[in-house]
Regions:
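Core nucleotide-handling region used for phosphoryl-transfer chemistry
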Residues: 1-184
């Protein structure tokens, strides 16, 4: 803010799209250009024998479905040496105690998809386009309990950083509505 004031430049107005916070654990699928894949948590590669809240066991339990997703990506989308990382929240069931989602079946909710050739070359994808491309255009079966963050209601707000308090009441209303009746 002080740099903008110093240069006599107004602060930006930014549009934000938010989703409901899902209380679970971060998980990902990493799919290589050759169709091979593995699971990972935020910090490490996981397997059914060395798992994170049962995510790898669920993925490997649906191995045929994930093999089809990987085959679709590797033959139709990925270039040589490229990988795709599919990030999401593994939630529901007994993954987190004392949260509303614990009464729902376990599910993987994708919130981010990234294509990369190395750490420097990354392209984040819109999950809705990816969902359409893989599961609708190619007709690849969707694994059970797989969702996308935008399958549930999202919330759009515009923040004018010159007057950020103008959006404060709207944010409180959204928060209270979700607390009263979570849309997930």
């Amino acid at each position: 803010q002080s740099a903008c004031a110093y240069h006599n430049v107004p602060l930006p107005t930014v549009d934000f799209r938010g989703t409901v916070k899902l209380h679970g654990t971060n998980a990902a699928m990493v799919i290589a250009h050759d169709g091979t894949w593995h699971c990972q948590s935020r910090e490490r590669i996981i397997t059914p024998q060395d798992d994170n809240a049962g995510f790898a066991a669920w993925v490997y339990g649906n191995k045929d479905d994930w093999d089809r997703v990987a085959a679709t990506l590797s033959t139709a989308i990925l270039s040589d040496e490229e990988t795709v990382q599919v990030y999401g929240e593994w939630c529901g069931g007994n993954i987190q105690k004392n949260v509303g989602l614990s009464h729902l079946p376990k599910m993987f909710v994708i919130f981010g998809i990234r294509f990369s050739t190395d750490a420097e070359s990354t392209a984040w994808q819109e999950t809705n386009k990816w969902k359409h491309y893989v599961f609708e255009h190619y007709g690849t079966p969707k694994p059970s309990n797989l969702h996308f963050a935008d399958d549930f209601p999202t919330y759009n707000v515009t923040v004018d950083f010159n007057s950020p308090t103008l959006v404060q009441n709207q944010l409180v209303e959204i928060t209270e509505a979700v607390e009263k009746d979570c849309p997930v």
